[in-house]
């Protein structure tokens, strides 16, 4: 399977061995797998382990399957890696879950854990590089936070977030990376729909107009154009 995904070589008949993906995404899990059925995520396949444990220590034996694919990708020439999150660790969330069950459209992160969230991400970036030899070129702390899809049903790990919440967290993550001499670039988010970048699509203004919000200096509450490690990039999924 790794050859099919990553290889840029040809076989004896001159046919490509694979599709030669140039970047591989790694899902930094929030701990729903450890919660089991209590996670309220029905399918075990949709749950994810977390490096951070309840006692505050890190278990670098977690997420072995995904980490193995990072190594397989690197061995086959992939040189760009992106880490992303669907949810903060369950120890930091408002409802103690990695899903948005029973909540509204704001970030599922307790007020007192914003800095801990940033520290967790710095530790993951450093830990994976130390233990697996994989340097993440990019980190995306928020996956589809505009949340035009149904955040009520616990299908998988995930949380919405307003632009103000994203900006607040990104500034703290940026500061943590600078303090730890981490040069991984921080992507503002991965939008669930391109239209959320320049308008509102099945959501409200608090989670829309993302380009304007994050990269126009007039958007003083959410502007990230001067934050270290934050490139002027917007990422989205077209589906």
Please report, for each region that a protein language model flagged, where it lies by residue.
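N-terminal catalytic cores of secreted or lumenal carbohydrate-active enzymes
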Residues: 1-137, 156-167, 171, 175
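Acidic-enriched, low-complexity/disordered segments with a strong bias for Aspartate over Glutamate
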Residues: 3, 11, 37-38, 55, ...
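Active-site groove signature of glycoside hydrolases
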Residues: 81, 85-88, 125-155, 188-192, ...
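Active-site-proximal beta-alpha loop/turn segments in soluble metabolic enzymes
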Residues: 102-110, 144-161, 191-200
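Noncatalytic carbohydrate-binding groove/subsite architecture in carbohydrate-active enzymes
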Residues: 126, 156-239
């Amino acid at each position: 399977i790794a050859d099919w995904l990553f290889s840029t070589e040809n076989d004896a008949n001159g046919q490509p061995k694979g599709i030669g993906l140039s970047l591989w995404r790694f899902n930094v899990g929030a701990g729903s797998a450890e919660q089991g059925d209590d996670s309220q995520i029905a399918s075990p396949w949709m749950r994810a382990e977390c490096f951070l444990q309840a006692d505050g220590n890190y278990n670098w034996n977690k997420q072995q399957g995904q980490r193995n694919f990072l190594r397989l990708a690197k061995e086959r020439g992939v040189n760009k890696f992106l880490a992303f999150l669907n949810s903060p660790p369950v120890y930091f969330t408002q409802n103690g879950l990695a899903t948005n069950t029973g909540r509204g459209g704001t970030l599922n992160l307790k007020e007192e854990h914003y800095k801990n969230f940033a520290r967790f991400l710095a530790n993951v970036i450093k830990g994976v590089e130390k233990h697996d030899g994989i340097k993440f070129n990019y980190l995306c702390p928020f996956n589809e936070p505009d949340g035009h899809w149904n955040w009520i049903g616990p299908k998988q790990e995930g949380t919405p977030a307003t632009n103000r919440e994203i900006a607040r967290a990104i500034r703290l993550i940026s500061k943590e990376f600078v303090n730890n001499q981490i040069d991984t670039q921080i992507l503002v988010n991965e939008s669930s729909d391109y239209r959320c970048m320049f308008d509102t699509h099945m959501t409200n203004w608090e989670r829309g107009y993302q380009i304007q919000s994050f990269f126009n200096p007039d958007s003083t509450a959410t502007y990230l154009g001067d934050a270290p490690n934050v490139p002027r990039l917007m990422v989205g999924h077209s589906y």
